[in-house]
A protein has these predicted regions:
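Extended glycan-interaction surfaces of carbohydrate-active proteins
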Residues: 1-5, 42-124, 157-209
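Amphipathic alpha-helical coiled-coil segments and their boundaries
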Residues: 2, 6-9, 29
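Peripheral, non-catalytic segments that deliver or gate enzyme domains
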Residues: 6, 117-141
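Amphipathic alpha-helix face/heptad-repeat signature
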Residues: 9-12, 36
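Well-ordered alpha-helical scaffold segments within catalytic/enzyme domains
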Residues: 11-30, 79-89, 130-142, 195-206
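Extended, well-ordered alpha-helical scaffold segments
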Residues: 16, 20, 27-47, 89-101, ...
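Short amphipathic alpha-helical segments
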Residues: 93, 127, 131, 144-151, ...
Length: 209
C-alpha cells in the first residue's frame, strides 16, 4: 500500500545516496557530493525517528497515515544493521529478537505470521539471510551470524541431497523445501545459488584462519 514507508527500501536508498555522494567526491564535485550526503543524513534521521518501535524494540515499516509503525516485525528490520543505521543499543535489541523469535532450524523465518503466503512463515529467503548475517557482523554479533549461516547452509544441503536441486525458498521451520503463495516452488535459483556460494566460501575461509 502507498500508506506504508518501507524500512528496507529506505535503508537501500540511504546506501545509494552515500555511494553517489562518494562518487561525486571522487569526481571533484563537492557541491553535488554534499547534496547527496545531506540527503542520506536526513534519511537516516527519519528512519531512526519513524521506523523504530520502542515497544517492540525492533525496526518496522511506518504507516504515515496512521502516524505510527505497523507493529509487524519482519526481516526488513535488519536492513538497518546492514546499512549501519541502527545505534549499538538498537542493534543489540534487534539481535536479541532475531535469535529468540526469527531463528529456526533452517535459518531465519521472514516474518512471524503464518498465513499461507510465500513471504511469511515458515519460509526463509536467501537474500534476507545474507542481509541479516552481514548486518549482524557490522555490529560484532559474529556468533549469531555464524549460527544463521550454518543452519541455512545445512537446510540447503538437506534439500539438495533429497531433491538434487536448489530451490527458490525454504521452509526454515522444518528445514525443507518451501511452499505457499500463488505459484509452484521454482527450481534454480539465482539468489539461492549466489548466497550459498558466498556463505560457503566465507565459512571455508574462517575455517582456515
Amino acid at each position: 500500500t502507498t500508506d506504508i514507508v518501507a524500512v528496507d527500501l529506505n535503508c537501500l536508498l540511504y546506501q545509494l545516496e552515500i555511494t553517489i555522494a562518494e562518487a561525486f567526491q571522487l569526481l571533484k564535485q563537492p557541491l553535488l557530493a554534499r547534496r547527496y550526503q545531506t540527503a542520506a543524513e536526513r534519511r537516516k534521521e527519519a528512519i531512526l525517528r519513524y521506523c523504530w518501535n520502542a515497544e517492540s524494540q525492533f525496526f518496522e515499516d511506518y504507516n504515515f497515515r496512521k502516524g505510527h509503525t505497523t507493529g509487524r516485525r519482519t526481516l526488513a528490520g535488519v536492513f538497518t544493521l546492514y546499512a549501519k543505521i541502527a545505534t549499538s543499543e538498537q542493534a543489540a535489541m534487534v539481535a536479541h529478537t532475531i535469535k529468540q523469535e526469527f531463528l529456526k532450524k533452517g535459518g531465519l523465518v521472514t516474518t512471524l505470521e503464518q498465513n499461507g503466503q510465500q513471504w511469511d512463515s515458515p519460509n526463509g529467503w536467501a537474500p534476507l539471510q545474507y542481509i541479516a548475517i552481514m548486518g549482524l557482523r557490522e555490529y560484532g554479533y559474529h556468533g549469531l551470524a555464524n549460527e544463521i549461516r550454518d543452519r541455512w547452509l545445512a537446510a540447503n544441503d538437506r534439500v539438495f541431497s533429497e531433491k538434487r536441486k536448489m530451490v527458490e525458498k525454504y521452509d526454515v521451520v522444518h528445514a525443507e523445501a518451501g511452499g505457499g503463495g500463488e505459484y509452484p516452488l521454482q527450481d534454480g535459483f539465482g539468489w539461492t545459488n549466489g548466497v550459498y556460494a558466498a556463505l560457503y566460501d566465507e565459512k571455508e575461509r574462517n575455517r582456515g584462519e
